[in-house]
């Protein structure tokens, strides 16, 4: 009887240990953004506004994705250094920075977005309107943060590999007055439905991804992606790969 109790206790202890390990692994969760550089707004088309990805985004596992088209893997040390530097540059900055008095007025240009995940686990983002045009009127830390992320983007463009994903964001923009001969709507790709004002967007996966990539190859000019739906409506069809956390 004493031996049986001991065996039961050991079994329960082992089961408890296994449960604790599973819980720990579940809490780790997927990789998260830890640093980013992107843009918002500006004088761009509705399609570009929806499809525009971060210029460069760094994930907790060291993966760098640039323009949702190129990727590069950093070492743990490089990832940690990048996050630490971005945190130094952005800590204490307001959510929306303003240039010093005397800065020239600049309109219709994108707002630069810089971000880093702090030690508290929260994403700190700073927006700087027209940073490229009036950098001298902003704190130098913002330009340094952008320079750091720009360096990652340059590395990925030169030595990275193509980024692909199993999920795609597609956008159909109404083109009733477009010139040129439209192609039939690609089989397997969802047709726009409901309100289109002025665009219709949908995230797709599976066979639809292969179908849209075949119909509109990556990098193809929008002027060559004119399609007619089964109802006769004309649309310009565009897409990009979704990022891991989208």
What are these regions (language model features)?
Residues 4, 48, 104-106:
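Generic marker of residues within folded, mature protein domains
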Residues 63, 87, 119:
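Residue-level marker of positions within ordered structural domains that often coincide
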């Amino acid at each position: 009887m004493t031996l049986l109790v001991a065996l039961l206790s050991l079994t329960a202890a082992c089961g408890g240990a296994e449960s604790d390990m599973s819980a720990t692994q579940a809490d780790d969760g997927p990789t998260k953004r830890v640093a980013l550089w992107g843009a918002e707004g500006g004088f761009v088309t509705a399609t570009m506004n929806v499809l525009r990805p971060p210029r460069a985004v760094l994930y907790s596992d060291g993966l760098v994705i640039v323009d949702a088209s190129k990727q590069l893997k950093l070492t743990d040390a490089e990832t940690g250094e990048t996050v630490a530097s971005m945190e130094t540059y952005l800590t204490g900055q307001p959510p929306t920075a303003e240039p010093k008095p005397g800065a020239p007025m600049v309109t219709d240009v994108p707002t630069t977005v810089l971000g880093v995940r702090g030690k508290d686990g929260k994403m700190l983002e700073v927006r700087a309107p027209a940073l490229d045009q009036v950098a001298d009127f902003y704190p130098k830390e913002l330009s340094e943060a952008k320079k750091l992320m720009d360096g990652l983007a340059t590395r990925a463009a030169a030595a990275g590999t193509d980024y692909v994903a199993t999920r795609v964001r597609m956008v159909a923009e109404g083109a009733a007055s477009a010139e040129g001969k439209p192609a039939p709507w690609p089989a397997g790709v969802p047709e726009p439905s409901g309100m289109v004002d002025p665009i219709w967007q949908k995230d797709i996966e599976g066979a639809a991804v292969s179908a849209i990539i075949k119909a509109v190859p990556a990098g193809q000019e929008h002027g060559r992606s004119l399609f007619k739906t089964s109802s006769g409506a004309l649309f310009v069809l565009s897409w990009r790969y979704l990022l891991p956390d989208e």
